[in-house]
Design a protein with these regions (language model features):
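Tandem CBS (Cystathionine beta-synthase) repeat/Bateman regulatory domains
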Residues: 1-141
């Protein structure tokens, strides 16, 4: 008769189930938005006062039409220095990014995390039925 020894019995670890965590659970709902006709001077002042890096641009119908960022503002500042015009008179619509990647509040947070890695973006506007309802950033995830 041969007896075999398999070592000390190990307790099986319970299976971990990742719950369906949505963007709505982590997104920011209180947003600072801008108007396409605002001056870049107003935007820069708001970004500095609120200590934010950018914001969504909403048209008169309340629909997302772009995003304005620190980088977009820098373009206006550099243009003013180059042409020796101290006024930041350009409009948001002249500098905003209009090709905006968005997500919806029901999306899985892990899917959005992968989008952050793949697209090299820092934030996504969250739209529900075509309306801006929030923003999800890398810091939120």
């Amino acid at each position: 008769m041969v007896k075999s020894y398999r070592g000390v019995a190990q307790a099986k670890s319970p299976k971990v189930v990742i719950q369906d965590v949505s963007v709505a659970d982590y997104m920011t709902r209180r947003l600072i938005t801008f108007d396409p006709d605002q001056t870049m001077e107003q935007v820069i002042k708001t970004l500095l006062d609120k200590k934010i890096a950018g914001g969504q641009v909403i048209d008169t119908r309340g629909e997302l039409c772009g995003i304005i960022s620190e980088g977009d503002c820098l373009k206006e500042v550099v243009k003013g220095k180059y042409t020796n015009t101290p006024s930041l008179s350009g409009k948001v619509s002249d500098y905003m990014s209009t090709n905006v990647q968005t997500v919806n509040p029901e999306m899985n947070i892990f899917e959005v995390a992968q989008m952050f890695l793949n697209m090299k973006l820092r934030r996504f506007p969250v739209l529900k039925d075509g309306k801006l309802v929030g923003q999800i950033s890398q810091k939120d995830v």
